[in-house]
Amino acid sequence: MAKAKFERTKPHVNIGTIGHVDHGKTTLTAAITKVLHDKYPDLNESRAFDQIDNAPEERQRGITINISHVEYQTDKRHYAHVDAPGHADYIKNMITGAAQMDGAILVVAATDGPMPQTREHVLLARQVGVPYILVALNKADMVDDEELLELVEMEVRELLAAQEFDEDAPVVRVSALKALEGDAKWVESVEQLMEAVDESIPDPVRETDKPFLMPVEDVFTITGRGTVVTGRVERGVINVNEEVEIVGIRPSSTKTTVTGVEMFRKLLDQGQAGDNVGLLLRGIKREDVERGQVVTKPGTTTPHTEFEGQVYILSKDEGGRHTPFFNNYRPQFYFRTTDVTGVVTLPEGTEMVMPGDNTNISVKLIQPVAMDEGLRFAIREGGRTVGAGRVVKIIK
């Protein structure tokens, strides 16, 4: 069957829902798709709650990551929306999902107000570089007391300000459940939320002018056509028939040619920064490429094993370690799409690092990773996120 071409007429924005597990992230995601489908039926298909909630499991290193991708459009923009429904691993995996957001909708239940997870998500959003957060004050139909709503709103604004997000961001009172049920007042609340998303999340500054780079998330074999790697283009543009290099993890890099680009199961002539695409690679076997590598313009990215990083170590309350760590600590460093074990050297004069500390560390990785200064990473122990940081200096 011939594939339809993907029309690139509107700005494309990656967003997601973050927040405490029972506050209604998934219900809100379903409500947004339904309300936009009803408002712009030509532009959107509706997605049922259970289609989103039964997110495909992505198993990585023995951890189950549930992430659901939906797409929808407003008059102004085309959105790709990620939601990781209520799984206990949500927080640990936020680093993988949140890295793909140009903005986030923080879902806070008006009935509860901000919870510890709410705080942790906002903190992680800051660490992984989500540029903008606005707020959906969900379950607002269940709170009659105007003063209580204002109090919760104030708390949420303080929370945003504490992590240097815009404390004047829109806070929209919604009821995702009532909107799904078709209650006119609350349908309108979701329309208002999406207007706020359109207006407040800045147009992403796409990195289309930089050299092409795409982290590999998954690898497939398509019978008769070859090997496809999927991921979100981090920067630059890739055209069909361009040469690329596969860098990182393995001792040596591999060159190949891109023979096809697909997005949302539609063919493109090119993929550009911010697009989730599949690239068909010429002459590459399934086992020649793996998650954690990057596909890049030849000669523009180099793999490294030693670097200095500026890190924040989660406190016990944020779900982090309960005890300090010392020199030669050996956690996993999660870069883009995969974990690599590394050995930590503490700065001169520092005996140990406590949960809740900010510090600089030197790291020696056991496998090379394609990196530049400014690249962010998570620090994990057996799949549990215990810290986050960014590369400040490459040593080797």
From Swiss-Prot:
Pfam families: GTP_EFTU, GTP_EFTU_D2, GTP_EFTU_D3. Keywords: Cytoplasm, Elongation factor, GTP-binding, Hydrolase, Magnesium, Metal-binding, Nucleotide-binding, Protein biosynthesis. Residues 83-86 are annotated as: G3. GO terms for molecular function: GTP binding; GTPase activity; translation elongation factor activity. Residues 62-66 are annotated as: G2. Its EC number is 3.6.5.3. Residues 175-177 are annotated as: G5. Belongs to the TRAFAC class translation factor GTPase superfamily. Classic translation factor GTPase family. EF-Tu/EF-1A subfamily. Monomer. This is Elongation factor Tu.
